Amino acid sequence: NEVKFRGITQINRLILFGGEPFLNTQLFEYIIKEFSKFTTILKIETVTNGTVLNNNVKKIIDNFQPYLTISLDGPEFIHYKLRGKGSHRKTTKFIHYLKTINYTNFEIASTYTRLHQLHSLSRDDIFQYFTNMDVHFNINDVFSKNKVLVVKEMEKSLVDRKKFITDSINNIVENNEKAFISPILYDVLISMIYKSTNHTFCDDIDPSNTITFDVDGSKKLCFRFWGTHNSSKAELFNNKEYFQQCKDCWCKGMCLECVANIIDGYSSVINEDGQFIECHKPELMEYCIKEIIYLSQDQSKISKLVNNFKRFIRYA
């Protein structure tokens, strides 16, 4: 009723979360059909653990072709420690099913934690694990204040991050579309190729772009604020003009930063009190641009970078 009242006739992305959304396929289907009565839905997305695979789930996949983000944290033993015994087998079975029906509309989301480090699993090990699986994937450090989970020395060195950018450019040029590319390069290319400008840190919490509903029907800023978790600081912290360093920054139009991470104290750029810490994005974005300029000396390679990039645009 809220969406209908606002006169919305097109939904660019309908994103359905859980818990585990596929535990209630009837509700999943009901929401889509109700919205379809008065809107055009361009894309349906969901985040799943991939632990439920029955005829109802298969029907959902077949009928609605949702973009699936599947949670898998690495090899069997580490995934079991994080998500429970038996979960890895179910999730890999789910992925195998998608491959057997040639369903390519999915990616793996992996969370890198301190437990990975304690069991001698580096990010490169996890990267190689998913590369060997031949799937689209992304790897993110855990957001947690639990010292058992939080990654020691979470930030890569600037040298490593620059190498990651160079490797990412090569992967795009070579069309290795299942490779995970640098988020910094991603933001730069989105801005340069599609001529977009990010006026705020996060468009997802802008009510003119996005409406988020909790399970009880109440409106929230984004899914990170479901339940009782909310903050009056969100609108303030989403304003780049509020921070002097950001206000005067040459690359602020390309910059994205998760406001929920800032509020929850997980951002390495701005703390939960709104105090600026440090930011290496200007240096890294400048490096991206220099690498792109260098690449432009080869017309074939720069054309491949621009034309292939659309295949690397992911759920975020």
Q: What is each stretch, according to the model?
A:
Residues 55, 221-222:
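Short capping micro-motif at the N-terminus of alpha-helices
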Residues 25, 55-57, 79, 117-119, ...:
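Generic domain-boundary/flexible-linker signal
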